[in-house]
């Protein structure tokens, strides 16, 4: 198999400046809604990139849980590698690959922790099994076998068979305050359309970038 021979044309249509919303959050919500309507698998899945203390980058797929004018929100174990890295360096990058629509969105910004009240509101809305899993898994730690994790889950399931499950102190969310948001639309002959929104003291500048 020759990887260099794997290619296709992008035919979904171009993106013009006049098509864009003035606010990139509004534009993002429009594209996200269209991704959902297109029946895409996991349209809220995004790559979250962070760096460790030595500048080594790490990436993982995380689900976006909310977005508004204040930023993009996701939740995680606060002892996880990404949370620890954000504690040392709050700079972060998000990437949404909406391949069926021939679109990408790339976001850079700064991550800040959510308030305990915000964490509690979302935690209590989760399915019971998801709440238990958040307690059972010490994310990114080494375990001897999957059975250890499953055993802990069953133990907690029996313990909290009745009543509410307490939110663990080591679980919570981050809000990514965007500094830049780039919208990418595939184009014919590799002449893709790219528009970069840059936050300048609360106002958004828009630039077209070469593909």
UniProtKB/Swiss-Prot annotation:
Pathway: Cofactor metabolism; pyridoxal 5'-phosphate salvage; pyridoxal 5'-phosphate from pyridoxamine 5'-phosphate: step 1/1; Cofactor metabolism; pyridoxal 5'-phosphate salvage; pyridoxal 5'-phosphate from pyridoxine 5'-phosphate: step 1/1. SUPFAM superfamilies: FMN-binding split barrel (SSF50475). It comes from the Bacteria. Its cofactor is FMN. It is an enzyme of class 1 (oxidoreductase). Keywords: Flavoprotein, FMN, Oxidoreductase, Pyridoxine biosynthesis. Its EC number is 1.4.3.5. Binds 1 FMN per subunit. Substrate binds at residues 7-10, 65, 122, 126, 130, 190-192. The keyword DNA-binding does not apply. GO terms for biological process: pyridoxine biosynthetic process. Gene3D superfamilies: Electron Transport, Fmn-binding Protein, Chain A. FMN binds at residues 60-65, 75-76, 81-82, 104, 139-140, 184, 194. It catalyses: pyridoxamine 5'-phosphate + O2 + H2O = pyridoxal 5'-phosphate + H2O2 + NH4(+); pyridoxine 5'-phosphate + O2 = pyridoxal 5'-phosphate + H2O2. Homodimer. Belongs to the pyridoxamine 5'-phosphate oxidase family. Catalyzes the oxidation of either pyridoxine 5'-phosphate (PNP) or pyridoxamine 5'-phosphate (PMP) into pyridoxal 5'-phosphate (PLP). This is Pyridoxine/pyridoxamine 5'-phosphate oxidase. It comes from Vibrio campbellii (strain ATCC BAA-1116).
């Amino acid at each position: 198999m020759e990887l260099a021979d794997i290619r296709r044309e992008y035919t979904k249509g171009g993106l013009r400046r006049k098509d864009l919303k003035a606010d990139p959050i509004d534009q993002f919500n429009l594209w996200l809604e269209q991704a959902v309507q297109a029946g895409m698998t996991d349209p809220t899945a995004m790559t979250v990139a962070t760096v460790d203390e030595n500048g080594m980058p790490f990436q993982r797929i995380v689900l976006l849980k909310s977005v508004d004018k204040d930023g993009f929100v996701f939740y995680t174990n606060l002892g996880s590698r990404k949370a620890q890295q954000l504690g040392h360096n709050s700079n972060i990058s998000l990437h949404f690959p909406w391949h069926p629509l021939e679109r990408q969105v790339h976001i850079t910004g700064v991550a800040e922790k959510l308030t305990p009240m915000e964490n509690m509101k979302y935690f209590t809305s989760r399915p019971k099994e998801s709440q238990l899993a958040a307690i059972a898994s010490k994310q990114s730690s080494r375990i001897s076998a999957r059975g250890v994790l499953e055993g802990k889950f069953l133990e907690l399931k029996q313990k909290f068979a009745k009543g509410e499950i307490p939110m663990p102190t080591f679980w919570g969310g981050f809000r990514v305050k965007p500094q830049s948001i780039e919208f990418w639309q595939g184009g014919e002959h590799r002449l893709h359309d790219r528009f970069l929104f840059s936050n300048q003291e609360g106002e958004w500048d828009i630039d077209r970038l070469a593909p």
